[in-house]
């Protein structure tokens, strides 16, 4: 039976992939203005594929046995949505609340609040170890709502994109004559790993689906890592023999190659980032799209000068 609330109008019920998937995807696209966002549209396409699989396999996992999401319905029309995505880290249940969307004509009625509260009650009953969500940094209304429900901002992440095409190295930005760029050596891994863990903390790395132990030069000894190892390359930037940065390049990914940058947080970080990525783009890049995730406030000037654009800025919020 659906749970009813006196306010707002309508009622909440469990998402049913056999009837809700198309309208929910349309709702998400409109609410988050994804039509002109290639990354967002790719995510929607993945959601369509998952919805299709759910429809085909509904007899294996009927809607009554799991809870991928909730919808809000008014007069037979779905006007709100929330998804619950589960991850497991060392057997601990970590939940991500995602795609909280309400149709424009029904915003401000408390639907998003009701959906989020219901999702939190559900996750509490499932004894989720941690509950997280991502929200656009400039979405003040949503952030205030989540703060009232017990969420706190843990960190802010910039998602950068370099579009495919011909790239020309900017001139006059920095004097790079003292830097040496080359293939990463075995001895560089310890330094790289330390800086990666600083830039990409473990408490949110589960979402990025990246395992830095596979960046290790010793990963080749693990037969299970061979596929990923063969699509990774690593480069080191040094100044007078001292490591200043390491760049890892994941290529052959579905929508865009990925870069993972290991740098010390110093006053020279912009210069080191510029030197590291400029050399990579000039000598190794194959003109395809690139995405790079990096902490807010770090290396922003370098990335902008190299032609990267800020795709989105997201706050990671955690329930406390």
Locations of the language-model features?
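Conserved acetyl-CoA-binding loop-helix of GNAT-fold acetyltransferases
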Residues: 99-102, 108-121, 125, 130, ...
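Conserved beta-strand in the GNAT
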Residues: 67-71, 77-86, 96, 101, ...
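Active-site rim helix/loop that mediates acceptor-substrate recognition in acyltransferases
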Residues: 28-74, 78-79, 83, 206-232
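Conserved active-site alpha-helix within GNAT-family acetyltransferase domains
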Residues: 113, 137-155, 295-312
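Conserved catalytic-core motifs of GNAT/GCN5-like acyltransferases
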Residues: 134-135, 152-166, 309-319
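A short, internal acetyl-CoA/4′-phosphopantetheine-binding micro-motif in the GNAT/acyltransferase core
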Residues: 71-73, 85, 98-107, 259-273
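Amide-forming acyltransferase catalytic core, primarily the GNAT-like/NAT-type
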Residues: 13, 51-53, 58, 152-254
């Amino acid at each position: 039976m659906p749970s009813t609330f006196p306010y707002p109008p309508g009622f909440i019920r469990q998402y049913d992939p056999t009837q809700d998937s198309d309208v929910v995807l349309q709702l998400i696209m409109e609410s988050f203005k994804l039509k002109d966002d290639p990354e967002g549209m790719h995510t929607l396409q993945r959601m369509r594929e998952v919805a299709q699989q759910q429809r085909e396999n509904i007899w294996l996992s009927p809607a009554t046995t799991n809870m991928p999401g909730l919808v809000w319905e008014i007069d037979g029309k779905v006007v709100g949505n929330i998804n619950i995505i589960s991850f497991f880290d060392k057997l601990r249940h970590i939940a991500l609340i995602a795609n909280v969307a309400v149709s424009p004509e029904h915003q401000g009625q408390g639907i998003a609040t009701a959906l989020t509260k219901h999702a939190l009650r559900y996750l509490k009953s499932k004894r989720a170890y941690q509950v997280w969500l991502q929200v656009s940094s400039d979405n003040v209304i949503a952030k205030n709502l989540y703060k009232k429900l017990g969420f706190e901002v843990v960190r802010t992440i910039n998602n950068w994109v370099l579009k495919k095409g011909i790239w020309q190295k900017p001139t006059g930005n920095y004097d790079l004559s003292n830097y040496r760029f080359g293939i990463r050596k075995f001895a560089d891994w310890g330094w790289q790993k330390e800086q990666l863990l600083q830039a990409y903390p473990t408490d949110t790395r589960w979402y990025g689906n990246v395992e830095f132990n596979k960046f290790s030069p010793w990963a080749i000894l693990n037969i299970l890592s061979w596929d990923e190892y063969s699509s990774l390359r690593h480069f080191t930037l040094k100044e007078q023999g001292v490591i200043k940065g390491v760049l890892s390049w994941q290529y052959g990914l579905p929508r865009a190659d990925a870069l993972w940058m290991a740098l010390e947080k110093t006053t020279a970080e912009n210069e080191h980032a510029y030197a590291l990525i400029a050399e990579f783009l000039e000598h190794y890049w194959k003109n395809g799209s690139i995405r790079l995730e990096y902490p807010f406030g770090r290396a922003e000037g370098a990335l902008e000068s190299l032609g990267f654009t800020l795709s989105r800025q997201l706050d990671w919020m955690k329930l406390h």
